[in-house]
A protein has these predicted regions:
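A short secondary-structure junction signal
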Residues: 97-99, 125-128, 142-143, 162, ...
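Membrane-anchoring hydrophobic helices of lipid-metabolizing enzymes
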Residues: 1-84, 97-99, 109, 127
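Conserved Motif II region of HX4D acyltransferases
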Residues: 82-90, 147-200
Length: 231
């Protein structure tokens, strides 16, 4: 493939896209810090090395890259027939998304799809398993159609109804309120809802930062930047 850059993370380009002309006022030390905390160089080496892997094979490569060790209980209880909506708590962020996609994708021969933020469609290896959704921006008008198309397909659906990974609330680590979309759409499309539970937690720094952002009213999900080091 001629242009490997389409697979790579480019913080400078992202800032220019999101901030426009204002991006030139962002101090260089800030962009350097962002590149470091998201592990841009390490991730780009991985993305380059795995550029020919797609779907479940790409998720398997992700598991190996993350050196993820997962203990699975109850695999024999997964439905053998029918279309399912698999819903799970979201304790870690990207890591549990990768793990569940790999486990279910391998079990069902790749016949699974995530409902995900459209930004993840930029990951070439993940894109075949994704149904892109975006409630904001130019794509917002198509959001209902995309959800409908996903649930009407023959693929199993993987969802994290909380939307964001778990937070510490009143000393207890738990999901935010689950959105009911998965229930209403599963009923409409005659899907079985299969609840899954993923055990894990992020660092105290992550939870403290999340609560601080909430306290001061920062709406941007800054904590997302730290999930790679928080688990």
């Amino acid at each position: 493939m001629a242009d490997d850059s389409i697979f790579l993370i480019d913080i400078d380009k992202i800032l220019k896209t999101k901030a426009g002309k204002k991006s030139k006022y962002i101090p260089r030390f800030v962009t350097s810090y962002l590149k470091r905390i998201v592990h841009q160089d390490e991730l780009n080496v991985f993305l380059h090395d795995s550029k020919d892997k797609v779907g479940v094979e790409f998720l398997e490569a992700c598991m190996e890259f993350l050196d993820a060790k997962v203990e699975i209980k109850g695999l024999e209880n997964l439905p053998k027939e029918g279309k399912c909506t698999f819903v799970s708590n979201h304790p870690l962020g990207g890591q549990d998304g990768v793990a569940l996609g790999y486990i279910l994708g391998k079990h069902y021969g790749g016949n699974v799809r995530y409902l995900v933020n459209d930004l993840l469609m930029n990951l070439h290896g993940l894109a075949p398993l994704c149904i892109p959704i975006n409630k904001t921006g130019s794509q917002s008008r198509d959001f209902p159609k995309m959800v409908e198309a996903g649930f009407s397909s023959d693929n199993h659906i993987i969802m994290f109804p909380a939307g964001l990974c778990s937070r510490r609330q009143n000393g207890v680590i738990r999901d935010l309120e689950w959105k009911k979309t998965f229930v209403t759409k599963s009923v409409e499309t005659q899907r079985d809802v299969v609840p899954l539970h993923f055990e894990g937690r992020n660092s105290d720094f992550f939870y403290n930062l999340a609560n601080l952002c909430k306290f001061v009213g920062i709406k941007f999900n800054i904590c997302l930047l730290y999930t790679s080091d928080a688990a």
